Amino acid sequence: NWENDGYDVKNFKGSVIRNSNHYFKESISWSKISSNTIAFRYKPFGHIFDVAGTSIFGDHNILIYLLGLNNSKVISTLLKILSPTMNYEVGQISSIPVIMANNDTKKIIKELVERNIEIEKEDWDSFETSWNFTTHPLIEYKEAYGYGSDLNDWSYKIKDAYESWKLNCDKKFKLLKNNEEELNRIFIDIYGLNKEIIPKVDDKDITIRKADRLREVKSLISYTVGCMFGRYSLDEDGLIYAGGEFDESRYKKFKADSDNIIPITDEAYFDDDIVQRFKQFIEVSFGKETLNENLDFIAETLGKKGTETSEETIRRYFVNDFFNDHCKIYQKRPIYWLLDSGKKNGFKALIYMHRYNENLIPKARLDYLHRVQTTYEKLLSDVNYKLTTDLSMVDKKDAQKRQADLNAKLQEIKEYDEKIAHIANQRISIDLDDGVKVNY
């Protein structure tokens, strides 16, 4: 936190500030220790460096030239000789011999390197963990195909959007690879190493990602949840809400959840649970005409089982896997928090950390947990009555299984109610400035 000229950092006990005159300057950085080929990264204005990622500073044109050179096979080959242990200190990097090209070649190098930076940035910004994320690629690329007679009410297929996105990713992948190989050729020629080094780059060494159907569908689901909570909006690009005053007028096409609590149930008990909201989002985003086909595409991607409907597959994903995937994406610092009663899935609900307030847990308990409990009690009463009637062996066995499941859920939810009541009564508040890890 460098607010107020780094006041908190400078006054933190044991804090050591080094080279602060270089803070926020344009630079190239690299990791001191690498298990693979060293990689040099471009950092535009506005970043602070640390000792784990050492930096090079200078004029923009020089930095761009050095970025192209240092990421070439010429320098990676030299560094294997200079530092066979793959420990890259300033000494090894500063000992790299730099041969400057003529002006015409410098211009070519600059164009190739800056285009590569642009491609890498576009790739990174397509993921919601980027500060510059605008919208999900499958939303952006849906415009490639449309269905319907009314241009104002077209429907779109997620499958088509994915194929369009995939073509775009493949094109950028090939362009980046070609550019890197051309840079290798240029620097190999400058250093006179044509007989020692070949310019070819393996696909595994290209750092942008190709399209992946499962990853893109899961990230679309994550983006959808973000829209449910108001983190994102279909009306505006980028991050819409991460604290401060919540403005409901910024969510016209798809309304953000009003109370910041979205229940996750293993069956369709309510019309406002996460699966129903998800279906609404897909319909609003891609159209009514293609809704079922789009749900099928999503379910098949997630691994639809035998007799499952597409909705059941999507529900299973939300119940069992969504939160785990979310924690992986955000490196165990989730911004969506899960209220979870336990292994029986008696009660689950998501809340958005940035909209949390001290009344949220009491509301979740009274308006949602107790509603789920009442639903289970009614269902159990129906099953108990059914078991008093004349049933076939198969139907009786199914009813007994249902009875046991509901009893287990009720027991779990009652125990959870006691625990969450203790938290609710404390009316705990959080400070967003403390960060996700502390608050979670």
Model-based region annotation:
Residues 21, 31-95, 102-105, 111-119:
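Basic, amphipathic alpha-helical recognition segments used for DNA target recognition
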Residues 1-58, 107, 129, 158-170, ...:
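Polyanion-binding catalytic cores of nucleic-acid enzymes and NTP/SAM-utilizing transferases
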